[in-house]
Amino acid sequence: AEKIKICLQKQANSSFSLHNGFGGNLYATEEKRMFELVKPKAGASVLNQSTWIGFGDSRTDKSNSAFPRSADVSAKTADKFRSLSGGSLMLSMFGPPGKVDYLYQGCGKHKVFYEGVNWSPHAAIDCYRKNWTDIKLNFQKNIYELASQSHCMSLVNALDKTIPLQVTAEVAKNCNNSFLKNPALYTQEVNPSKQICGEENLAFFTLPTQFGTYECKLHLVASCYFIYDSKEVYNKRGCDNYFQVIYDSSGKVVGGLDNRVSPYTGNTGDTPTMQCDMLQLKPGRYSVRSSPRFLLMPERSYCFDMKEKGLVTAVQSVWGKGRKSDYAVDQACLSTPGCMLIQKQKPYIGEADDHHGDQEMRELLSGLDYEARCISQSGWVNETSPFTEEYLLPPKFGRCPLAAKEESIPKIPDGLLIPTSGTDTTVTKPKSRIFGNDDLIIGLLFVAIVETGIGGYLLGSRKESGGGVTKESAEKGFEKIGNDIQILRSSTNIAIEKLNDRITHDEQAIRDLTLEIENARSEALLGELGIIRALLVGNISIGLQESLWELASEITNRAGDLAVEVSPGCWIIDNNICDQSCQNFIFKFNETAPVPTIPPLDTKIDLQSDPFYWGSSLGLAITTPISLAALAISGIAICRTK
């Protein structure tokens, strides 16, 4: 009889890289980073498709006869907008003659505003004021501020009011021989023979607690009044000074102008200018007192429920070629905390006409069709990686990646993996070992780690005996990683406390502080991932060792009396009794069917943070199955000795 010795052959060479882990090491033919850097996409997006609403005009109006060529959004996104061609929130607030008057109202956690262009210099609205841009800026700023604190908002287009009997509604030549719907202009006829100066006007209006189905906790009201250069310009008959003042129910002045105590401008001119201040007022009854000749009466408001903090996105709204625009929307958003501004980089070039259907704007708003993990001033991200190459500019909400250098992200083994025995003394040793301490044993094992992300933790052995990770080992591993993470976070908190001392009212200092805090978070997370990587490598190593032990046991069982295991991973076989086909059956069975080993694991690592939080709070969670694939033997290298 001719006896030969068949062993599993060691296959490591200089092309392999060594990966040290907690509880075991690996040699691997390849390696990859635990996460890749992501790049934000420019433009707007939302965190949740079911909780946002838009307010727009013809560029989001699905009922426009030229839709979809006239639109800057998809049909799906247009359904989310409250829009009417020719409309704008400010037009509906003031109601200038001949302009679209649309009842804007709706509810959403995230509000997207793409409107404003219909009240711009091109509209040439006068009504005692040729340039309304500063009023528009103040109006839009207040809208964005209140919208960010409310779930629902609505135009209230008819306030209850009481006006004095001696006044009548009036029109103005410089307002298309009409006047604004809000404020309404009332005048008092003065009979010089009886009463030269007339009577002081006293009027009342009520801000409701509810308008239709919309609750009103706060109203945005336009407090409008005339500005005169001098008393003589106001009243050439020598009557008293001009005043128009709003009082709350307690008699406190909340808005207006009183030239009895405030000086006139002192400029030269004989035509008054109308000024409108934006007031945030609670529901209730208010009084208006004015000098006899004119009364400007609030008739409308925007109502907000103030029920929850939310997100606001404002989209730059400008005309195309040949029409003059303003940039009040841009300036209002930039001066409102938490408002994200979407801006074009090129002139507006429409498809339907010069002013409707711009390709760049369509690209910037295409993200509204999707849900993002993070939205920011820098753009939106829907990839799961926690890292981006550049710092995302605030405001930002959701699970936002942190800035990191690619080389700082830990690498994990990939491709062909070879385990070493490791040093975790709490791991049960296989009854029949095919490896010695720090030896390399291989049956050409291949493990695939699929999806973007990392394979994860092996949380325990399926066998009560044999190799693998014991409960005690896993507990000790997680105790170690937990302690190390707490140390990292404690160090981060100490650094943040030191930075707190540097906070000032200077905006740049606050921005610098925010950046430093994010950098500290990024460094802490990278440290945490380093610990996770070490535990991951160790547990994969132990799992592979168990797989090899199972392979050796399977070979011994298949061989029966035909082969005798003389040492770990080596068998003596009688060549005359077991020919080549017999040996192939024993040693090469895996070419037709892989050896069942470790099942898929629930081990995906994800970053957790509170939605709508400025920045990302760091927390690690093990979530859905990611698929450390079952180990399949791809081939056994056999060495034979006689």
UniProtKB/Swiss-Prot annotation:
The biological processes this protein is annotated with in GO are: fusion of virus membrane with host endosome membrane; fusion of virus membrane with host plasma membrane; symbiont entry into host cell; virion attachment to host cell
- Which keywords describe this protein according to UniProt? Disulfide bond, Fusion of virus membrane with host endosomal membrane, Fusion of virus membrane with host membrane, Glycoprotein, Hemagglutinin, Host cell membrane, Host membrane, Host-virus interaction, Hydrolase, Membrane, Signal, Transmembrane, Transmembrane helix, Viral attachment to host cell, Viral envelope protein, Viral penetration into host cytoplasm, Virion, Virus entry into host cell
Catalytic residues in the record: S58 (nucleophile), D353 (charge relay system), H356 (charge relay system)
Which EC numbers does the record give?
3.1.1.53
**Mod. after translation:** In natural infection, inactive HEF is matured into HEF1 and HEF2 outside the cell by one or more trypsin-like, arginine-specific endoprotease.
Q: How does it sit in the membrane?
A: Single-pass type I membrane protein
Specify where the region named Fusion domain-1 lies, as residue ranges: 2-27
* Record has GTP-binding as a keyword: no
UniProt xrefs under SUPFAM superfamilies: Influenza hemagglutinin (stalk) (SSF58064), SGNH hydrolase (SSF52266), Viral protein domain (SSF49818)
What are the boundaries of the region Fusion domain-2? 353-638
From the Swiss-Prot or TrEMBL record, state where the protein is found.
Virion membrane; Host cell membrane
Q: Per the record, which residues fall in region Esterase domain-2?
A: 298-352
Family membership noted in the UniProt record: Belongs to the influenza type C/coronaviruses hemagglutinin-esterase family.
Query: This chain belongs to which protein, by name?
Result: Hemagglutinin-esterase-fusion glycoprotein
